[in-house]
Every structure is written in C-alpha cells, then in structure tokens.
Amino acid sequence: MIAIFFSIAAVPAYAEEYSSQTEYTKAKDFVANINFDFFFSSSDLGEDVIADLKNIQDYITSHRDYTMDDLCDLVEPAKTRVNANHATKYDYSSLLPTSKDVLNAKEKEVFNSNPIYGLSVLLQASYANSQEKGRFGSNTWATNGDAFRHALWNALGTQFTSESYMRRFATAHETGSSDYDPNSIDTKMDLRNNATGRSLVKSMDLPSNPPNGMVIPYLISNNIATATKNGKLVRFVVAGVQYSTLRATNSATTN
C-alpha cells in the first residue's frame, strides 16, 4: 500500500485532465491530430509556439513511445514578463491569441496548469482565425464572423483537450482582459458563443481514426458554420448597425 501511495503522489497535477486511455495511445492520438505542415506555415502563430511544435516534432521522430506528460515537458511555460514590442505584434481585438507572450495573467495560469493542452488551444485559435478570415473576410467584430470564430475555437479546444480545460481558458480570455466588463454586451456575446461551441461539438459525428490531422478540424468548422447560419450563435452588429441586445446569427459567409 505504501508503494501505491507514493506512485499516486508522483503523478503531475495535469494528469487528471487526461482520459482513461492508455498513456501511449492518448499521446499518439493527440499528436495525430496536429497537422505540423499547416501550423508551421501559419501567418499568425508566435515564434514561441512554433518552437514548441518543432520540439514536439523532433521528439516524436526520435522516440517510438511517449506519454502526454512527456509532451508537456517539451512545451515552455508561459512567461509572466515578456518584451512589450513582441506582445503587441498582433491585433488581438479581432483575433484569438496565438502566442504565449500575449496571454493575459489568467490565461497564462491556465496554460501553465497543462502546457500541452495550452499549446493545443493556441493552435486551435490560429485555425479558427484562418477559418473566419476565409469565410467572412475582415472587419467581423460583433458579427456572424466573430461569433463563428469564438464558437469554433471552443469546439476545437474541447475536442482536442477537454471541456473543462477549454472552459477555463476561454473564460480567462474574457475575464482576464484589461477592459473586462461582465455587463458589456461584447463580453456576454463572447461567453455565450464560447459555451455554445463547447456544447455543440459533443454531439458531432466525428471519425475516430481520421486519415490526417486536418479532417476533424474541417468537419468541426463546417458544423459550426452551419450553426452560425441557422441562428445558434449570437451577435450584436447586424448589417453594420450596432444593437444593445444580442441577435441571432444568420449566415456562414457574410457578416
């Protein structure tokens, strides 16, 4: 009994996030859903995230077996102090975070509680940003496109990490913002679309063994686009007019 006690005590805090799958299977499945070529060519991923991805790619190339804990150890924690110029490289008023450097204090706390999950959330943010731009173009604040992006990010994060982790990260993204106001319609819109994305993905019919790492994100994106078109999400800017109440979304291609 004593040996068992010490074995349990040595398990990292983030281990409880993982499913009941075997250590190796869970890690292999996790990596199989990362399309390294796609993310290496991303225009908005931070250099820190690219470096983490390269570490993972090198490690899995030279190691036959590895666990989620091994992958966690390959990801650099989010630093509490960063170069201010680097932190303002991207406009995060219209994009989701894709670098550890630009995360707020609450997001960094969640990221560091499970770095490999945190890295995945940033990767999913990059994918959601690109999908929104491809479908809706620019200037999407508070519109169909904005709603789509937040819901897609949360759906992807739930699928590839866990619902609880994605909920904590997305909530920290809102509540840790310097201009956070729980009563603002902007905050209410984001939190609601975040929650809807996490809920919708649980009922999606997704393949258990996709041929590559882009199949499931593509299917989830299409499902969220359909939900956007069918009014499952909310916005408060309609045809260029800003309203004081939330309105249902109505298109998967226009704002």
Model feature map: region roles:
Residues 1-3:
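Sec-dependent N-terminal signal peptides
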Residues 5-21:
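Sec-dependent signal peptide cleavage junction
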Residues 21, 174, 225-227:
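Intrinsically disordered/low-complexity terminal segments and short unstructured peptides
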Residues 23-155, 159-166, 249-255:
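Glycine-rich short-loop/terminal segments
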Residues 139-219:
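Catalytic toxin/effector domains delivered as secreted proteins or via bacterial secretion systems
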